[in-house]
């Protein structure tokens, strides 16, 4: 036991100036806390025992097509719909003026029937240029890290694990270029979420969609690797 050598004082430390705290280099070095968006979301997922299941996997040998994930929470059912398409290297840009992407995806409230799927397939790849459905809670798009993606597929197809150094340089297979919510481009308003049990926390629907995107990215590289070399292909080590 450690005994205090003197009285405990309740002296508040002065707040640092905003100009210091908000420096980009300083912000980039902050470690996640219990209040971080991702940690709050994954804690809710665990405590409420959310279940995410792939219920539709329609990709060709090169990994293009559509995939549907079902999300069951304690309160409701949602789906994340992903569309993967081929684009040239010249079309791949993270600039806001881009009009085509490797992936477009969204988080949908409720079931996805044939009519809704047809509407999403027609409009979601267009993003802001499309007529988006009001049951969409999140609308997003992403581009590949071509270097990482190709390296991961090649390694898995050869029966090996990718070199971790690739992730040290760019720690992703896909990077989102925009993640829209709260009524943007005609999707559901925040009023649909704020009184519910699932997505009342800030940015939680957006983080959920991106969480499923990460799961899709792994499933896609494994799928392509299996088609490239069925005899040797392995799955990605979860530690990566």
Description of each model-found segment:
Residues 27, 52-55, 217:
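Short secondary-structure boundary micro-motifs
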Residues 1-2, 73:
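Gram-negative host-targeted secretion-system effectors, predominantly Type III and Type IV
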Residues 2-24, 99-240:
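Mixed-charge, Lys/Arg-enriched low-complexity segments
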Residues 31-34, 41, 62-67, 200-202, ...:
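N-terminal low-hydrophobic presequence detector
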């Amino acid at each position: 036991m450690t005994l205090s050598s003197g009285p405990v004082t309740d002296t508040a430390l002065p707040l640092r100036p905003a100009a210091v705290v908000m420096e980009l280099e300083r912000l980039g070095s902050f470690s996640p806390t219990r209040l971080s968006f991702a940690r709050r979301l994954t804690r809710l997922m665990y405590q409420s025992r959310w279940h995410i299941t792939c219920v539709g996997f329609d990709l060709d040998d090169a990994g293009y097509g559509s995939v549907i994930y079902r999300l069951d929470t304690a309160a409701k059912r949602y789906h994340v719909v992903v569309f993967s398409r081929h684009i040239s290297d010249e079309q791949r840009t993270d600039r806001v003026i881009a009009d085509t992407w490797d992936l477009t995806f969204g988080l949908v409230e409720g079931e996805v029937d044939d009519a809704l799927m047809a509407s999403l397939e027609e409009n979601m790849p267009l993003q802001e240029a499309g007529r988006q459905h009001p049951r969409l809670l999140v609308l997003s798009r992403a581009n590949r890290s071509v270097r990482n993606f190709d390296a991961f597929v090649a390694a898995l197809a050869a029966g090996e694990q990718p070199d971790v150094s690739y992730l040290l340089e760019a720690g992703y297979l896909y990077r989102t270029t925009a993640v829209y919510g709260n009524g943007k481009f005609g999707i559901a308003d925040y009023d649909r979420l704020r009184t519910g049990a699932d997505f009342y926390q800030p940015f939680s629907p957006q983080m959920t969609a991106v969480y499923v995107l990460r799961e899709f990215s792994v499933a896609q590289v494994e799928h392509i690797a299996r088609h490239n070399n069925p005899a040797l292909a392995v799955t990605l080590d979860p530690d990566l």
